[in-house]
A protein has these predicted regions:
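Short alpha-helix boundary/capping elements
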Residues: 39-49, 70, 103-107
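C-terminal amphipathic alpha-helical interaction region
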Residues: 4, 8-16, 30, 58-127
């Protein structure tokens, strides 16, 4: 098995090549489509880099909140069921913090340049 380069490094290298070498010579609608493709590669690179740790942390928080073990999908379904039944709400200790952290982790992958996300990282967001 080949260890280097990692899938993340390969994706970043392709995205950088497209961004730096190909984008300057492409015009019009094809340039737009190229930027969409580069953005998709950047998103996949962030998913590979961040999601395993984010998912593990989310599952650990949910296990603590719900007092049960399971896959991330199972735990999220259990949380949704308990919310729907009125057993859990924003007054439940730890739930608001869990939801906030989960949102921040997802933004780090999906929209790291989102202005509100950046403000929160700088400590100027949520009071």
């Amino acid at each position: 098995m080949q260890d280097e380069p990692t899938p993340t490094e390969l994706i970043k290298a392709v995205a950088d090549f497209l961004r730096n070498e190909v984008t300057p010579v492409i015009k019009g609608h094809n340039a737009f489509k190229l930027r969409v493709g580069i953005n998709a590669l950047d998103l996949v690179a962030r998913q590979l880099a961040l999601e395993p740790d984010n998912d593990a942390a989310e599952a650990a928080r949910l296990s603590g909140l719900l007092g049960m073990q399971g896959s991330l999908g199972e735990l999220n379904r259990a949380l949704a069921d308990r919310i729907a039944k009125g057993e859990v709400d924003l007054r439940t200790p730890g739930l608001a913090d869990h939801l906030w952290q989960t949102t921040m982790d997802k933004l780090a992958v999906d929209q790291p340049n989102y202005a509100s996300y950046k403000r929160e990282l700088e400590g100027k967001g949520r009071a």
